[in-house]
Structures are given as structure tokens and as C-alpha cells.
């Protein structure tokens, strides 16, 4: 799975002018499933998100996880993270999982996250969403998790 996480002081997602998810301080996580991903990969991504130390400690160093900082997670599906722009001016999204597989993995990711942390908010899979955020830092980190890969 491909994730782009941003440390935020606040974030929300809206669909058709209706607020569907909102957090205060925490992580906004844009996520995309790839065809080779499984439920175990989604679980591994949640583990990484909850343990990654991107929040400041009392000395000002990034040494606290979202759990330790008491922050929220706002998880939003975004298949465009799998874009391949190497073949011209129009991106290809063939690196993203098919929609139904993506939906199943997104729901697994949410269920696992909610079983291990609170609050966990989300966007609406497949919807045209407006994501509003105040980036804190800014801290923006790409994260790729899979059976054969773990970056960074």
C-alpha cells in the first residue's frame, strides 16, 4: 500500500459540502491499495502509522508517535498515489488496485486502525472529496508498505 501522511494541527474531509470526517492534531493519511496488497499489508501499514515518531517531544525532537501524542487519524482513499507519469503527459493509474479490491483493503485498514486507536475518521471511498488541512511543520512523509517493500 502507498500512503502519504501529513502531520496536521487540524484536517477535515467533505463530500458534496457535507463533512464526513474531521480531526484536530494528528495525521492525515492519504492511502492507495496496489494489486498485490492483502489484508496483512493493510494491517502492517496501520502498525507503521501508529508507531512512526513524527510528533515533537518536550525537547522539540520528532520522538513521539500519534498514539503518544494523543492525535487522531484521518484516513482518505486516493488511488492517484499510484500514478505513473513516465509515459507522457497523462498519468496512468494502472498501478492502483481495482476499485473493489481497493475498497475491501481500505475498509480493512479502517477497521484495524479503529481497533487499535481513537479517534480514527475517514473519507468516503470513491467519492469526489474536498480535503482541508493545516499542515503542521510541515511534515509530509511518503510510506510504502507491502510484502516485499517497506519504504522509508
UniProtKB/Swiss-Prot annotation:
It catalyses: glycyl-tRNA(Ala) + H2O = tRNA(Ala) + glycine + H(+); a D-aminoacyl-tRNA + H2O = a tRNA + a D-alpha-amino acid + H(+). The keyword RNA-binding applies. Gene3D superfamilies: D-tyrosyl-tRNA(Tyr) deacylase. One of its GO terms (molecular function) is Ser(Gly)-tRNA(Ala) hydrolase activity. One of its GO terms (biological process) is D-amino acid catabolic process. A motif (Gly-cisPro motif, important for rejection of L-amino acids) lies at residues 137-138. Pfam families: Tyr_Deacylase. GO terms for cellular component: cytoplasm. It is found in: Cytoplasm. Its EC number is 3.1.1.96. Its main location: cytoplasm. The keyword RNA-binding applies. InterPro entries: Daa-tRNA_deacyls_DTD, DTD-like_sf. Keywords: Cytoplasm, Hydrolase, RNA-binding, tRNA-binding. Homodimer. An aminoacyl-tRNA editing enzyme that deacylates mischarged D-aminoacyl-tRNAs. Also deacylates mischarged glycyl-tRNA(Ala), protecting cells against glycine mischarging by AlaRS. Acts via tRNA-based rather than protein-based catalysis; rejects L-amino acids rather than detecting D-amino acids in the active site. By recycling D-aminoacyl-tRNA to D-amino acids and free tRNA molecules, this enzyme counteracts the toxicity associated with the formation of D-aminoacyl-tRNA entities in vivo and helps enforce protein L-homochirality. A Gly-cisPro motif from one monomer fits into the active site of the other monomer to allow specific chiral rejection of L-amino acids. Belongs to the DTD family. NCBIfam families: D-aminoacyl-tRNA deacylase. This is D-aminoacyl-tRNA deacylase. It comes from Methylibium petroleiphilum (strain ATCC BAA-1232 / LMG 22953 / PM1). The lineage of its organism: Bacteria, Pseudomonadati, Pseudomonadota, Betaproteobacteria, Burkholderiales.
Amino acid at each position: 500500500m502507498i500512503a502519504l501522511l501529513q502531520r496536521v494541527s487540524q484536517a477535515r474531509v467533505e463530500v458534496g459540502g457535507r463533512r464526513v470526517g474531521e480531526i484536530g492534531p494528528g495525521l492525515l493519511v492519504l492511502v492507495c491499495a496496489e494489486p498485490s496488497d492483502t489484508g496483512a499489508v493493510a494491517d502492517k501499514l496501520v502498525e507503521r502509522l501508529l508507531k512512526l515518531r513524527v510528533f515533537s517531544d518536550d525537547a522539540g525532537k520528532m520522538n513521539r508517535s500519534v498514539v503518544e501524542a494523543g492525535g487522531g487519524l484521518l484516513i482518505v482513499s486516493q488511488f492517484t498515489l499510484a500514478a505513473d507519469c513516465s509515459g507522457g503527459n497523462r498519468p496512468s493509474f494502472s498501478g492502483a488496485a481495482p476499485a473493489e479490491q481497493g475498497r475491501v483493503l481500505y475498509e480493512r485498514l479502517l477497521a484495524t486502525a479503529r481497533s487499535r486507536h481513537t479517534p480514527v475518521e475517514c473519507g468516503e471511498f470513491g467519492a469526489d472529496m474536498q480535503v482541508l488541512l493545516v499542515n503542521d511543520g510541515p511534515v509530509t512523509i511518503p510510506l510504502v508498505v507491502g510484502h516485499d517493500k517497506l519504504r522509508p
